[in-house]
Amino acid sequence: QIHGKQLSYNNYNDIFSALTISRSLPKGKGTVIVKHANPCGVSAKNDHLESYKSALSCDPVSAFGGIVSCNFKIKSDLAVELNKLFLEVIIANGFDSNAIKILKAKKNLRLIDGTNYTSGELFKFVSFNQGIMIQSEDLNIFSKKNFKVVSKRKPTSKQLKDLIFAFNVCRYVKSNAIVLASNETTVGIGSGQPSRLDSCEIAINKMKKFNLQTDNLVAASDAFFPFVDGIEKLVQSGVRAVVQPSGSIRDKEIINFANETNTVLLFSKTRHFRH
């Protein structure tokens, strides 16, 4: 920590989530905004100012009072933009001298240099009345080799890139999780709902609320769709490609629906389920 007041328990929890997500994004391009350990905006852009603005556009309301983590060095132009929003913590791979001067104008804003942060192998510990459970964190970075195209329609190279991006982000969203994305930027995130259909509707409504509809929309789900209704809702909202884990007794129905609607569908053998 190089500036700001003392970190709280919740700050540390959010910082870990933000650092972990930003480190999973393409190096030198990634920005993530986290609120209550959930990402509310994620983007990967070569232009750092655009990366932040794109992440913020996903849900600027939820971003208020959140944490921003960038896997690149913050310079003065971005610092000026960051100071326009109330934030608890900003994490980056360093800050140039002008950026520090600008950001220090807010005396309580916590600035963290995460340059030397390495995740390594991490474990999650959960205590309960009669004991403790330990499991390794879900940190694998997914690539093209981890997915199988099961629809007749094949993804374009752009769709595949966005699908991989969305699925990698999806693992950090509390289940049931749905991530809508375009151009390596989230445009709608539905999280923490007992019903996967409800998470679909939340993601869609967020996208519409902030006018982020696009012709190049893809969606990722952290687990399989138990019924057709979820993917149907996504396709009706403009989604043209979907990635989801397989394993449902209705997988064939999902594939048939994708083919009937000319939708790209990819299956993964791995579920996320963040709790």
Where are these regions (language model features)?
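ATP-dependent carboxylate/acyl-activation modules
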Residues: 1-275
